[in-house]
């Protein structure tokens, strides 16, 4: 298949507003994939690369564009481009950077303008398809003529969506029957949608339980006899990084079990370390024994998917919790209350925050375990943190946001140096009316632009909600926002009164203060890490 065909469908799907139209367009494309193109195409359409991150940034894309003119007649195939991405991923050692740039330049020399734009967004992780994955499942189901529920279940159990999609497209419903829960193979995790507060969650779910929401690393632990394997939320193996969790699970008095939970590092005072600190245990290269002594982990589990030969996925949440209590001591389970009143729910939420955690998750007592975010099953409620920041630039949108300035570059005031410091980007929290207004207003403030971005005078103030801060060498202030979203514009506030970098650094330092106190004069410096969500 030509890349141009996939790009055209991607653009069309992003521009469509009706779900049924998106499904139809994707299904028509999926039927045209060859077996070798299934994984490539599905990954690209949902904004992923099977090769993982390739370490290429905007300057490399700009250099590749300048190196040669684009072509007018599309000829690149999915296999052609995928082979180049594999070449880039394999480049290593001295001169690897030059090899990657040369490979990308060669690809861009064979691509049209639209294909170049698509590749740049795909490689930068900025190919946003309005949460396309749930739509993709329904599109595959239509293309393969299989029930969507059967397909979703197979994807959850297999972990590898491409394998399931290929089976569905080539073998239909019969091909899906071979997928089942297998010990020592990860299952795609169940996720939570957001709710504004615990009272809202209580009214939506009614018969529910509340659990503390921990800011740790999601882990899935499998035991089959004496063998134990642990996987991350992304289904990658992390067994070697967490020997203490392996020991705990291996010692359980059961023959086989699959547990879902969180791994956290705690400070001596009992408060949890920030997510970034816990993530040091999961770095690419590390001495697990040394890190264990320096930063021990605890596992707190909240679900059980299999127990002694019996799969529990289809059991209601209340029954899975009962099974979990039979297997695990209270010290290994996430704190939980069931059927709370509104007052009890508020108190439980406050208690979670007081212990240094993110908030709570409300869970339906009747819900089975299903991968992804399912409406009416799990709802997360977190304490909202906000900063008043200024808009420094905005990127042109794609798909249904084409022609509108969408992705805002936002920054804080730096009184010491003068001016403003970029803290992050966000395209979240803006409806169509706000997008239209901000496009007009930002263009009035334009001071320059490049191919994708309009730079503006720093005058417009926005209130931004965020989940946390992380150290980041990619940003000039060394700190970046996590999960930023616009709450509202602040026309009442001048840019000279917005949040300062001192405030931002104080928030970040406060989160890391426990670690600094514990390590004293210890050597510092951590790598930039990302929340696994």
From Swiss-Prot:
Superkingdom: Bacteria
Catalytic machinery residues: 213
Protein name: Probable DNA ligase
InterPro entries from the UniProt entry: ATP-dep_DNA_ligase (IPR050191), DNA_ligae_ATP-dep_bac/arc (IPR022865), DNA_ligase_ATP-dep (IPR000977), DNA_ligase_ATP-dep_C (IPR012309), DNA_ligase_ATP-dep_cent (IPR012310), DNA_ligase_ATP-dep_CS (IPR016059), DNA_ligase_ATP-dep_N (IPR012308), DNA_ligase_N_sf (IPR036599)
The EC number(s) this enzyme carries: 6.5.1.1
Keyword set, alphabetical order: ATP-binding, Cell cycle, Cell division, DNA damage, DNA recombination, DNA repair, DNA replication, Ligase, Magnesium, Metal-binding, Nucleotide-binding
GO molecular function, one term: metal ion binding
Gene name tied to this protein: lig
Cofactor: Mg(2+)
């Amino acid at each position: 298949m030509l890349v141009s065909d996939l790009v055209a469908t991607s653009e069309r799907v992003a521009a469509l507003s009706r779900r049924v139209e998106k499904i139809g367009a994707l299904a028509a494309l999926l039927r045209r994939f060859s077996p070798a193109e299934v994984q490539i195409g599905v990954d690209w359409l949902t904004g992923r690369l099977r090769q993982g991150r390739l370490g290429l940034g905007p300057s490399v894309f700009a250099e590749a564009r300048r190196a040669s003119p684009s072509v007018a007649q599309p000829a690149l195939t999915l296999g052609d481009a995928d082979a180049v991405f594999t070449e880039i991923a394999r480049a290593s050692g001295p001169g690897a950077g030059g090899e990657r740039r040369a490979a990308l330049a060669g690809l861009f020399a064979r691509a049209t303008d639209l294909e170049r734009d698509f590749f740049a967004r795909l490689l930068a992780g900025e190919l946003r398809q309005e949460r396309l994955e749930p739509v993709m499942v329904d599109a595959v189901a239509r293309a393969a003529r299989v029930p969507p529920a059967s397909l979703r279940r197979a994807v959850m159990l297999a972990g590898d969506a491409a394998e399931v999609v290929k089976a569905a497209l080539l073998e239909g419903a019969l091909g899906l029957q071979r997928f089942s829960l297998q010990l020592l193979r990860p299952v795609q995790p169940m996720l939570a949608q957001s709710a504004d507060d615990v009272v809202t969650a209580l009214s939506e779910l009614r018969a529910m339980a509340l659990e503390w929401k921990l800011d740790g690393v999601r882990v899935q632990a499998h035991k089959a006899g004496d063998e134990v394997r642990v996987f991350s939320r992304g289904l990658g193996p992390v067994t070697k990084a967490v020997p203490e969790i392996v020991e705990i699970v291996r010692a359980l008095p059961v023959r086989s079990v699959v547990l879902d939970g969180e791994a956290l590092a705690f400070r001596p005072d009992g408060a949890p370390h920030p997510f970034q600190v816990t993530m040091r245990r999961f770095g690419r290269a590390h001495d697990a024994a040394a890190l264990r002594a320096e930063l021990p982990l605890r596992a707190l589990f909240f679900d059980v998917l299999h127990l002694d030969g019996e799969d529990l996925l289809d059991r209601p949440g209340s029954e899975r919790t009962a099974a979990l209590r039979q297997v695990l001591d209270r010290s290994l389970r996430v704190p939980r209350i069931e059927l709370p009143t509104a007052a009890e729910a508020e108190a439980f939420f406050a208690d979670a925050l007081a212990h240094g955690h993110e908030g709570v998750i409300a869970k339906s007592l009747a819900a089975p375990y299903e991968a992804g975010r399912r409406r009416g099953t799990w709802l997360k409620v977190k304490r909202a943190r906000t900063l008043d920041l200024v808009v420094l630039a905005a990127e042109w949108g794609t798909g249904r946001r084409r022609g509108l300035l969408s992705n805002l570059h936002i920054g804080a005031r730096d009184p010491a140096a003068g001016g403003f410091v970029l803290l992050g980007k966000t395209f979240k929290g803006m409806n169509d009316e706000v997008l239209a207004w901000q496009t007009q207003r930002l263009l009035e403030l334009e001071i320059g632009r490049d191919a994708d971005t309009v730079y503006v005078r720093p005058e417009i103030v926005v209130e931004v909600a965020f989940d946390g801060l992380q150290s980041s060498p990619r940003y000039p202030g060394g700190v970046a926002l996590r999960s930023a979203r616009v709450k509202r514009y602040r026309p009442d506030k001048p840019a000279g009164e917005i949040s300062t970098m001192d405030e931002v650094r104080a928030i970040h330092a406060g989160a890391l203060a426990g670690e600094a106190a514990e390590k004293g004069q210890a050597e510092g410096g951590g790598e930039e890490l990302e929340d696994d969500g």
